[in-house]
């Protein structure tokens, strides 16, 4: 008595065979064979919504919509190689019920990483399902170092951060800033806040005193939906 059985649900199912044995044309008493068929995880490939660098993605497969996810299913995975992404690591541990890691994009362009995941049913027989993939795009988050400049009164300073030398500057980066603070207070005019994204940081500044004065801008770099840590530009106005 042999056959290949498929359980299309996420719980244990039974199949009952009623068997009549025969020998030399003589039928014996029937008997039954009851087969318990444990479910095997079946999970479709996942394309995760893009995330910003330094944030986590989380995938917790659920039963339904073509997926078969038995109660207690756990996951192990390998990862594709991408030298521009840190924070991704393979996992062969048992008992992991979600796939989640915090990923960092060290470049200035979107990067992709692929997780190849093996699901195993936990509460229903430890049946190993076919692998599925999770594809995650990690968008870069701007990172700009603090800078200083010196100008003459009545002229403009301009700062246009570039990628490299510790900076991460995606091509779509724009900048906003709060009202700059001058030292001594009120010594410099021309500085104002920028509430909509600008491609450069530039303003014409006037030193109203007879002494050297400084003004500090606190700037937030933004690329798409990803905002970087604010940085400062300190301008000395002679």
Region locations from a protein language model:
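Extracellular low-complexity Ser/Thr/Asn/Gly-rich intrinsically disordered segments
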Residues: 1-238
């Amino acid at each position: 008595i042999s056959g290949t059985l498929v359980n299309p649900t996420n719980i244990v199912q039974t199949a009952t065979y009623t068997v009549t044995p025969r020998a030399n044309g003589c039928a014996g008493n029937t008997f039954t064979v009851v087969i318990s068929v444990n479910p095997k995880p079946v999970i479709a490939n996942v394309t995760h919504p893009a995330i910003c660098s330094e944030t986590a993605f989380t995938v917790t497969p659920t039963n339904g919509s073509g997926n078969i996810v038995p109660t207690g299913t756990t996951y192990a995975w390998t990862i594709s190689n991408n030298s521009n992404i840190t924070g991704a690591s393979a996992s062969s541990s048992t008992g992991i019920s979600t796939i989640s890691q915090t990923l960092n994009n060290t470049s200035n362009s979107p990067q992709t990483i692929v997780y190849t995941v093996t699901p195993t049913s936990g509460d229903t027989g430890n049946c190993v399902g076919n692998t599925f993939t999770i594809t995650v795009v990690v968008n870069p988050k701007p990172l700009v170092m603090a800078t200083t400049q010196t100008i003459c009164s009545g002229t403009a300073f301009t700062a246009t951060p570039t990628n490299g030398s510790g900076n991460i500057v995606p091509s779509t980066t724009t900048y906003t800033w709060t009202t700059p603070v001058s030292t001594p207070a009120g010594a410099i005019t021309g500085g104002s806040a920028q509430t909509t994204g600008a491609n450069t940081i530039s303003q014409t500044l006037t030193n109203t005193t007879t002494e050297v004065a400084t003004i500090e801008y606190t700037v937030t770099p933004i690329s798409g939906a990803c905002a970087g840590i604010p940085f400062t530009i300190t301008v000395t106005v002679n």
